[in-house]
């Protein structure tokens, strides 16, 4: 929309927002400032006026619209990486919680010690966060539809994956724990073996 009054541009932005749209506005002039300021995302050009830059959220230093596409791609990829880490983290905690809780009701030796859980939280979570944060942007995210406004970061498919993988891991680990108890009880070697399998399952979950 060009060659229009500033209030007309702002009115167009407001009408789109009332329809539930997330509006991004680009502009470089002073008359674009009201629309840039009112939009959810205001993008000004690096060669634009200082008024437009102050009213916007992002300034395109190279004045290239291609930079907008790149920014959207990286933003969506970063969001998916955060979702992957949350799913990985909650799967670990869900598995550990049920294994320790059910193991206590079974009357067995504590299958996961406090030191082991501290190691998992410090070592595995740190390296998992670094690995997921360093994933390159995926161009395929541009084929996805925009997310609804206010959508929770943990979606239904993520909850399904957490419960599905977590339950499978719990069943496997409890079966292993029960076999150890039947064959003579858990000693320090069995405890180490159990913890090793727990860590390997989480590495498989990360991959």
Label for each model-derived stretch:
Residues 1-25, 39, 46-207:
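Membrane-embedded transport module
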Residues 36:
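Basic, alpha-helical nucleic-acid-binding regions used in initiation and control of genome expression
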């Amino acid at each position: 929309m060009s060659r229009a009054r500033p209030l007309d541009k702002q009115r167009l932005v407001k009408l789109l927002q009332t329809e539930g749209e997330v509006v991004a506005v680009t502009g470089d002039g002073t008359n674009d400032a009201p629309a840039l300021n009112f939009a959810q995302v205001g993008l000004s050009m690096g060669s634009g006026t200082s008024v437009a830059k102050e009213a916007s959220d992002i300034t395109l230093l190279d004045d290239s619209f291609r930079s907008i596409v790149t920014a959207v791609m990286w933003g969506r990829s970063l969001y998916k990486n955060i979702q992957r880490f949350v799913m990985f983290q909650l799967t670990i905690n869900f598995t550990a919680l049920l294994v320790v809780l059910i193991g206590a009701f079974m009357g067995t030796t504590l299958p996961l010690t406090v030191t082991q859980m501290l190691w998992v939280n410090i070592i595995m979570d740190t390296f998992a966060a670094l690995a997921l944060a360093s994933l390159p942007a995926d161009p395929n995210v541009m084929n996805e539809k925009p997310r609804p406004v206010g959508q929770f970061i943990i979606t239904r498919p993520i909850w399904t994956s957490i419960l599905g993988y977590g339950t499978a891991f719990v069943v496997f680990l409890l079966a292993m724990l029960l076999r150890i108890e039947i064959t003579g009880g858990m000693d320090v070697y069995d405890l180490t073996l159990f913890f090793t399998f727990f860590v390997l399952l989480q590495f498989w979950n990360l991959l």
